[in-house]
UniProtKB/Swiss-Prot annotation:
EC number(s) on file: 3.1.1.61, 3.5.1.44
Organism: Anaeromyxobacter dehalogenans (strain 2CP-C)
Gene (UniProt): cheB5
Gene Ontology biological process terms from the UniProt entry: chemotaxis
Compartments where found: Cytoplasm
Family matches, as InterPro entries: CheB-like (IPR008248), CheB_C (IPR035909), CheY-like_superfamily (IPR011006), Sig_transdc_resp-reg_Me-estase (IPR000673), Sig_transdc_resp-reg_receiver (IPR001789)
Name assigned to this protein: Protein-glutamate methylesterase/protein-glutamine glutaminase 5
Length: 362
């Protein structure tokens, strides 16, 4: 296990940058509640952030996009060019903020999370988990060459909390191939590369990318404009058909189902599974039950272990399984845990995954 930010060596040092004093206070309190994180300060704009960074170097910055004097995107570009550092974008759950947040990922931000809002106790706890996990993932990813991530070992709800009881093996008798994909930290760019390399008649795909609600719709629209396959945010009941990729909506679980000879998705609420909603484990386990040997499972870059057990269940059901390799993963957590469990038939660099998918689905 490597020493450095986010490991047992010392806490991750975080600088909070947001123009709202209330938000700065809230974010600092949420982050400070995690013993693996140390908040070294807060700044109301990028200029104040630079002054703070000169006094004490943070490991990670949380950054708002809408700020006075200099907007977050401009500051991010300057940071990446002059002083690369892991950045987590903290954005409001507003549709207008989705596109700038995606641009921030393209500019070098590691993660995008929603700002914590007032709500139920469960909602506040989930917001805390997501924010703290994002900061730790960013620290592991780093601004330069990716660093490996040790899988988190945490008490967690299993996918049984969301999945219905399995059906008989009779549901597996269909010839349609379906590809299920799971990704987290670093996944937005990895998925873009994966989907852009597929032809317009590629097998149907269902994808879980850990991302807040609202942002997944904008992410799907952006991919749709770049890829030969059609890409859309999944809606309950959407058919899984060749030439289309369905992106699981943020904050809801997406499951694969079968009706007659066709596959479709079910989108539903439910508890966090492996600290996430949507959960890769939920998607993979549903694919194991309803598609089995007709499925191909792919686990990609990401921190933690979401999807590792689901990929193992897919393999046991007869599906082909692939894990992204360490060299091309931004954070080698989810794939490494899947490999450790013996869940991956193949461990491949990112550029080799699209042609292998097509070969397996011929």
């Amino acid at each position: 296990m490597p020493h450095g930010p986010g490991t047992s060596a010392r806490p991750v040092r975080v600088l909070v940058v947001d123009d709202s004093a209330l938000v700065r206070e809230t974010l600092a309190a949420v982050l400070a509640s995690d013993p693996g994180i140390e908040v070294i300060g807060a700044a109301g704009d990028p200029y104040a952030a630079v002054e703070r960074m000169r006094r004490q170097a943070p490991d990670v910055i949380t950054l708002d996009i809408e700020m006075p004097r200099m907007d977050g995107l401009t500051f991010l570009r300057k940071l990446m060019a002059q002083h690369p550092i892991p950045v987590v974008i903290c954005s409001s759950l507003a549709t207008a903020g989705a596109e700038p947040a995606l641009r921030a990922l393209e500019c070098g931000a590691v993660e995008v999370v929603a700002k914590p809002r007032l709500g139920t106790r469960r909602f506040l706890e989930e917001s805390r988990v997501r924010l703290c996990d994002a900061v730790k993932a960013a620290a592991r990813a780093g601004p330069g060459r990716p660093r490996a991530s040790a899988p988190l070992v945490q008490a967690k709800l299993t996918a049984d909390a969301v999945l219905a009881r399995p059906r008989s093996d009779a549901v597996l008798q269909t010839t349609e191939r379906v590809v299920v994909v799971g990704a987290s930290t670093g996944g937005t760019e990895a998925l873009r590369e994966l989907l852009a390399a597929l032809p317009g008649d590629a097998p149907g795909l269902v994808i879980v990318q850990h991302m807040p609600e609202v942002f997944t719709a904008a992410f799907a629209r952006r991919l749709d404009g770049l890829c030969a396959v059609a890409v859309k945010e999944a809606a309950d009941g959407d058919a899984v058909v060749p030439g289309r990729a369905l992106i699981a909506p943020g904050n809801r679980h997406t499951l694969l189902r079968r009706s007659g000879a066709r596959y479709h998705v079910e989108v539903r609420d439910g508890p966090l599974v492996c600290r996430h909603r949507p959960s890769v484990d939920v998607l993979f386990r549903s694919a194991a039950r309803y598609a089995g040997r007709n499925a191909v499972g792919v686990i990609m870059t990401g921190m933690g272990d979401d999807g590792a057990r689901g990929l193992a269940e897919l393999k046991r059901s007869g599906a082909d399984t692939i894990a992204q390799d360490e060299a091309t993963s931004v954070v080698f957590g989810m794939p490494r845990e899947a490999i450790r469990l013996g869940a991956a038939d193949r461990v491949l660099p990112l550029p080799a995954i699209p042609p292998e998918l097509l070969r397996l689905c011929r």
